């Protein structure tokens, strides 16, 4: 099975207007990503406010995204839930709609054992024929995969990758030493992309690339061509942006940044709130200093 989980994957925001999906803005957002040749887009992840979506909205979001992308790049759907039955329904619907793969985290809040995490993903694996990326986000889910559970899950034929949002930079080395050769490891933290890939990562699921996909793509291309100096120069330039985009809970800052650049409304669903005035000012200053334009 072809492994689509590599390179630059943008964790897309979900645009809303008047508390409904803004499908016109969605088209602008996706076409901006296609224009700058990202390797894939992730729809309905945590950056996409997936927990705020009804099942019908989730379906509409995926269906519209598939139509807009029209097979130009792979689409990865988010299928995380603390209810295994509901997560299976998301995975089954993703398969039916025609996405190219999906990502899921361990069930949040309920704090399953490692065996429970394994059984959750085994159930998702059984319900579809799509490639799967594990999503390690312990600060969000409250629980994480052990290295042993990752190894065990990697033996299932369609579990092909791990997105790691942790800060243990030794982890990709440990995982790489035990898993099958075609199992990919990607970082979900913009600020550690180079350090992570130096330790065995093969890509990056990025929040910042919602607004600077061209610069993020250039960074990875330089890294992959062994132009370490060039990659570091770009990374250093982007560090203030990475900081600004996490000055408040993701996706609050990136939603405002996208709005400021004309991609969508600055509408975010409760319990999240729009960016504070100080956060807005910080984001505006960084966008101006980097001369970011859409």
UniProtKB/Swiss-Prot annotation:
It catalyses: L-aspartate 4-semialdehyde + pyruvate = (2S,4S)-4-hydroxy-2,3,4,5-tetrahydrodipicolinate + H2O + H(+). The record marks 46, 109 as: Part of a proton relay during catalysis. It holds the Pfam family DHDPS. It is found in: Cytoplasm. GO terms for cellular component: cytoplasm. PROSITE patterns: DHDPS_1, DHDPS_2. One of its GO terms (molecular function) is 4-hydroxy-tetrahydrodipicolinate synthase activity. Keywords: Amino-acid biosynthesis, Cytoplasm, Diaminopimelate biosynthesis, Lyase, Lysine biosynthesis, Schiff base. The active site is at residues 135, 163. Pyruvate binds at residues 47, 205. Pathway: Amino-acid biosynthesis; L-lysine biosynthesis via DAP pathway; (S)-tetrahydrodipicolinate from L-aspartate: step 3/4. GO terms for biological process: diaminopimelate biosynthetic process; glyoxylate catabolic process; lysine biosynthetic process via diaminopimelate. The keyword Lyase applies. Its EC number is 4.3.3.7. InterPro entries: Aldolase_TIM, DapA, DapA-like, Schiff_base-form_aldolases_AS, Schiff_base-form_aldolases_CS. Catalyzes the condensation of (S)-aspartate-beta-semialdehyde [(S)-ASA] and pyruvate to 4-hydroxy-tetrahydrodipicolinate (HTPA). Belongs to the DapA family. Homotetramer; dimer of dimers. NCBIfam families: dapA. This is 4-hydroxy-tetrahydrodipicolinate synthase. The gene is dapA.
